[in-house]
């Protein structure tokens, strides 16, 4: 701003359109609220912790009572300054459902989580830096139908770490791959 004032005082001209666009840099402030329900098992809890470790732009909140209305998620997201929400709902201590929602008035999707394997039991001994960003890779099946295109966009907004995230490191050292097989992601 001071450089623009010096230019204006020296040249007597106003700031150019390029200077105006420099001041209006669009910031990607995507934040994801991770929220488990009551009654999740230890394996499900470890899955939530693994996803939290993968997403440096996420905020984890305490467990939510599953009997409550799901519209509470919008209020919790707003209180935590998050515009995306991942809610892990456990039913009968067996089934795990993942709600993806773009809060407050965006689309939402309910996914059933099958075959849970945590990073500890798979012995992932890679050298990924904690908080580093990742590349998202999508199968070309996501371009086949409109509902898959919507899922691709939702997954991109949930898992893409913004460059300006608070805890994100400036390195890219791993890839998250999403593919469709037998109608499942």
Where are these regions (language model features)?
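Phospho-regulatory, Ser/Thr- and acidic-rich intrinsically disordered linkers and terminal tails
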Residues: 1-185
């Amino acid at each position: 701003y001071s450089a623009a004032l010096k230019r204006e005082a020296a040249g007597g001209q106003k700031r150019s359109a390029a200077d105006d666009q420099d001041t209006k840099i669009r910031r990607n402030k995507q934040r994801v609220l991770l929220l488990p329900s009551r009654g999740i098992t230890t394996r499900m809890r470890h899955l939530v912790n693994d996803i939290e470790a993968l997403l440096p732009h996420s905020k984890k909140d305490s467990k939510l009572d599953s009997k409550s209305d799901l519209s509470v998620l919008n209020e919790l997201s707003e209180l935590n300054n998050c515009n995306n929400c991942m809610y892990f709902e456990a039913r009968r201590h067996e089934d795990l459902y993942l709600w993806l929602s773009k809060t407050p008035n965006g689309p939402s999707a309910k996914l059933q989580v099958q075959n849970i394997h945590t990073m500890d039991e798979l012995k992932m001994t890679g050298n990924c830096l904690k908080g580093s960003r990742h590349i998202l890779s999508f199968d070309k099946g996501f371009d086949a139908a409109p509902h898959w295109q919507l899922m691709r966009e939702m997954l991109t907004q949930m898992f893409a770490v913004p460059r300006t995230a608070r805890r994100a490191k400036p390195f890219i050292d791993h890839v998250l791959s999403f593919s469709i097989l037998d109608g499942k992601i």
